[in-house]
């Protein structure tokens, strides 16, 4: 059986130049739609400079009459020490690495040097680390058991700071089934704070959306009766924009399904420089990347130890909408005279209260509304009525927004 036994170890300068720096810079990092900070001085600080006001003055005489300096906003990003580990059977590992090598046309298979093998092994591990970092920076929660729990992600931090004051993140609710993607993007722009809209000429604004919103927006563009839309439908689009602002699919749908406490659909309009991912391998002891073969288990193992974290800076530079709270009936349908109702609702960490109301066939209410109680997304209660045809659920979010569904 073929196997790869040579150990590889990266630390110090090699850890940066060979492994992490290529992964956290360039077009791939830009495509994330956020700011990526690698090995910035500790403590890692996200900074944003606000342009100074009017600095012109009447010239009356020589001398100095300096105005106010530009305002600097800063926020320290908390870094967590994380460990990435992967293990493969010797045979599977060899096959994966060999496939990476043979897939390149510039490789001489009769003369495979150690450099070729090392590059293939490194690429395999870097891809896994980059994907884990990307998913965690959006959906991470240190209070969660299991996956994506190494550091708190953007979604948890933003939802925790939603509110109505100028120091809160503006977040509204939306029903993906009842609102087009174009209307949602327009609403985010219309409801954005003036300071955020003023940054549009700088070219750093971006829409960050989940895959369902991105796909629906692309379908809406395909439906436009223009030759350009028809050609784009055939040839595909390199990227989507709304009024000149890029729309980026953050591609976390597979992970969201395993995080039922989070809204399953969301979109935000922000400045790229307002959200930052920080990774550090230079200022903490023990950071390294190792790849070795374990002969006792006949297994190839990979390990990386580094610091990572993410945060946003200014709430006034965020306009957000959360959705995907579609209820699922887990009890028997409520009869005409009422009965026990039980529903499962995703995104429960952002839900304040759920109210149920019986509705007759003619649309009139039947009986008194009741507040459903429950935990971890399952809500229940008992409805009473005389001619209930369906049940209307009102989901009130923690920021005061409300959504209505029928079950």
Predicted features by range, described:
Residues 247-252, 368-374:
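Short, surface-exposed loop motifs enriched in S/T, G, D/E and P with embedded aromatic residues
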Residues 362-371, 403:
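Surface-exposed loop/edge segments in extracytoplasmic proteins
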Residues 105-190:
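Alpha-helical scaffold segments that mediate packing/assembly in large oligomeric complexes
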Residues 337-343:
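Structural beta-strand segments of beta-rich domains
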Residues 373-381:
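Aromatic sugar-binding surface patches on proteins
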Residues 382-389:
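Surface-exposed, short loops/turns at beta-strand junctions within beta-sandwich domains
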Residues 2-40, 45-54, 152-179, 183-186, ...:
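Sequence/fold signature of self-assembling virion shell proteins
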Residues 18-102:
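Assembly/oligomerization interface modules of large self-assembling protein complexes
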